[in-house]
Structure formats: structure tokens, C-alpha cells
């Protein structure tokens, strides 16, 4: 394997895995590898780099996911990303959204494995950190038995050895991005076959992994797993990752959230809005007593002008009253 932290990864998720989300996840697990939201190469090159790329040092190991289809632009974006200190640069070959397709990148690149390889070769030549791929098994009417193998072969020829594979096809027309996460059937066996045909590669399985028990089962056959929606829909499960998969200690959810309160205070002092940070807590206490009141309090109050850390403390009193009394 290329890195021990690839054993358990938290997937890049648009509109979700920003730096605040990643800091929270790091407070729950010290060892899992974190990924940014996808950032387009053009945004990196022409946009506000500090806003798009800056991250907290506690996030390491953390990967930057790029979107694009022009080798030279991706190479420049990768170079800029590496200068910010990211541990890995990942190319998005899996997002099926119309907006991404219109830029000729994301999942539609499954149809152009030679171009993907050219992009990766340029990126690898530009940076010293590992360059990796996140992909689907195919798109639309492609035969996944061929499309996945063709992509992997081209990427390997370009020097890439780590693949995060969402074990579903993507339908570029007729399904929304949300539907593309559920409707196309999973084909774990195909991804496993590719792993067995390429034992030296690091293959991370993504798609349909909802619990740590699911992850443990897949880790008997794959090098790593990549957890998506469950990481924010039921964030508390992340607290047991280190114990189960890295021979570390489980983290108390209460301790992690208490640490996050301190982070929120620091960010508020720097001008960040409260709701930008509290939205990442909404899935933390699922099925716990007081969870509904916690979510309601945040939803009703965190977006109010001038909302401060007191709003968060009041909400947390519904789910972890003893910790809030001690604070």
C-alpha cells in the first residue's frame, strides 16, 4: 500500500468536506485520510487560493481533489496545491453532475482513458506528492468489465498506483448526482477482480459502505475503504475508526465535540459564520436522546445575525448536558 492512512478514507464530497468538516472529522479520527471537496483546476489557478486551498495543520493526512481535463492546467493546479502542503493530489474521474460534465471532466472522462493518463502524467511530473484517481466503473452504455480495466491500465502506464473506485456506473443523462449514488447497482466483484489482476496496486473501495462493520468486511479483500455519506449522516461512527482499523484508541464523541467547540470559538473570532461550522454537526448525534432538539436549535438559531458559540453550547446541552455544564 502507498500509505497506511489509505486503509480508511473519508470521501471528497461537494458542498460538504470543507476545512471545517475535515477538522471535525480529524477530531474524531487521528489516522483516517481526509479529502477536500473537488476544486477545479481553473479555480485553483485563477481564484482565491487562500480561500480555496488553505487548511488547518491538524487535518494531515489530507488530499486535494482536482477536477479538470487539460493536462497543463491540471499540472499547474497540482503544483499550487502541493505548495500548500497537501499530502496527495487526487483527480476526479467520478462526478456525474451536469455542471462537471459541461467542463468535460468528472465521470465523463471514463470515456477518455488516454486523456486521463495524459493528465495524470502531467500532474505527476509537476509534484513530488502521490497523484491518485477517484473513478467509477464506467458510464452509460459502457461495459464496466472493459471500461474500468481500460482506465486502470492507462493510469498505471502513467505511473499511478492508487485508485479509489466507486463500484457503480454513472448515468450521465437521466439520473441526478444524488440518484447516481444509489440507483446504479454496485459491482464489488468487478473491483475485486481488478485488484486480484493487479495485486501491486492500492485499490480503495467506495460506494454502499454505511457502517464500520461494512468497512471491516471489505478490508479483508481490499487495501482500503472510502466512506462517503455515512461520514456526515452518522458522524459519530468515525470516533471508533482508530481503534478498529489503526490499532489506536477510540475517541469519545463528547471529547471530540468539546474540542470542536474550541475550534468554533477560534474561527468565530476570525470572522467565520457560525452555521458554516455547526452544519457539520447535524448528523453527529443520530439516535441519541435529545438529538432532534439539538438539530432544531441549531437550524433555528445558527444562521441568525451575530450568532455565537452560545448557540452551539445551548444546542449541545440537549445531547451532552454534563460536558456543557463542565464547560
PLM features per residue range, with description:
Residues 1-4, 8-14, 20, 118-121, ...:
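Alpha/beta catalytic cores of nucleotide-metabolism and tRNA/nucleoside-modifying enzymes
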Residues 2, 13-87:
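Glycine-rich, positively charged N-terminal anion/phosphate-binding segment
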Residues 11-13, 37, 65-67, 92-94, ...:
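A cross-family glycoside hydrolase active-site/sugar-binding cleft signature
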Residues 36, 87-97, 157-170, 227-230:
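Non-cysteine beta-strand/loop elements that form the S-adenosyl-L-methionine
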Residues 40, 68, 95-97, 137-141, ...:
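Active-site-proximal loop/turn and secondary-structure-junction residues that shape catalytic pockets
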Residues 43-52, 97-127, 172-192, 213, ...:
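Active-site-adjacent beta->alpha loops and helix N-cap segments on the catalytic face
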Residues 61-132, 137-144:
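Active-site beta->alpha loop and helix N-cap motifs at the rims of alpha/beta catalytic domains
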